[in-house]
Amino acid sequence: MINKYTTQKILLVGANGYIGCRFLERCKDKYNIYSIDNLLKKNDLLPNINQIDYREMKINEINEFDICLWLAGHSSVPQSLADPEGCYDNNYSGLVNFMNMFKGKIIYASSASVYTSIAGAICDEDTTVGMPINIYDYTKISIDNYMSIMNKDFVSLRFGTVDGGSKHIREELLLNKMVKDALNENKIYLANPK
């Protein structure tokens, strides 16, 4: 969908987050990227990122872009449970409003959490999603369904747990927490050792 010879303009939403800042670091010199973030997590704003809430963008601003790479929103179940109204607004209703204005292609960060209720099954792209068991799952399933029903030009990336280095590391993720604990305390804590 995106290649290094493109003259297309890319809007990167969530550029200051865990995945967004790594994507921007790797691709900023190869593509025509305009990066934004609303600093929901109050991280320090990294260079080349504009502090803009996508929900405040006007239709003419949005449609200056050909492609939207959507890496924004409440990014975990714990964050979403702590702020369910914010999760719904950020992950669903705000995104629906944005998509209704945007005329280009959307590459969207969904989540493997859409399969949470399918216990023990191996899932692939053709697996039917399960019933949501929390607000995070609900917003991800709902936005996937909305884009399909509205015939939007989109790709939904259903990330599993992402780990690894980033300028804005997510310390609550299992592997990242284990590495941090091993380095800082010479111990690894198991949350559910049985």
Write out the residue ranges for each language-model feature:
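N-terminal Rossmann NAD(P)H-binding glycine-rich loop of SDR-like oxidoreductase domains
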Residues: 10-28
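SDR active-site strand-loop-helix element
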Residues: 13, 36, 68-72, 106-112, ...
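Conserved glycine-rich Rossmann-like NAD(P)H-binding loop of the short-chain dehydrogenase/reductase
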Residues: 32-42
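Rossmann-fold cofactor-recognition segment
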Residues: 46-59
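NAD(P)H-binding glycine-rich loop region in Rossmannoid oxidoreductase-like domains
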Residues: 58-90
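Conserved Rossmann-fold NAD(P)-dependent oxidoreductase catalytic core, especially the SDR/UDP-sugar
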Residues: 96-133
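NAD(P)-dependent short-chain dehydrogenase/reductase
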Residues: 133, 145-194
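Active-site helix of classical SDR
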Residues: 135, 139
